[in-house]
């Protein structure tokens, strides 16, 4: 499965799987 860090919410077909911290910003880890 593929995961990516997104700023904001995950899309419907993706599931929230954690958080990413990039340059002090919090992103959502979204996997599908």
Swiss-Prot record:
Protein localization: Secreted
Pfam families associated with the record: Defensin_1 (PF00323)
GO terms of biological process kind: defense response to bacterium; defense response to fungus; killing of cells of another organism
SS bonds (residue pairs): 3-31, 5-20, 10-30
Keywords assigned: Antibiotic, Antimicrobial, Defensin, Disulfide bond, Fungicide, Secreted
GO cellular component annotations of the record: extracellular region
SUPFAM superfamilies to which the protein is assigned, alphabetical: Defensin-like
InterPro entries from the UniProt entry: Alpha-defensin_C, Beta/alpha-defensin_C
UniProt KW Glycoprotein keyword: no
Statement: the UniProt record of this protein carries the keyword Cytoplasm: no
Protein family (similarity comment): Belongs to the alpha-defensin family.
Biological role: Has antibacterial activity against the Gram-negative bacterium E.coli and the Gram-positive bacteria L.monocytogenes and S.aureus. Has antifungal activity against C.albicans.
Name of the protein described by the UniProt record: Defensin-3
Organism: Papio hamadryas (Hamadryas baboon)
Lineage: Eukaryota, Metazoa, Chordata, Craniata, Vertebrata
């Amino acid at each position: 499965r593929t995961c990516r860090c997104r700023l904001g919410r995950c899309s419907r077909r993706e599931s929230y799987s954690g958080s990413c911290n990039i340059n002090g910003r919090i992103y959502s880890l979204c996997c599908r």
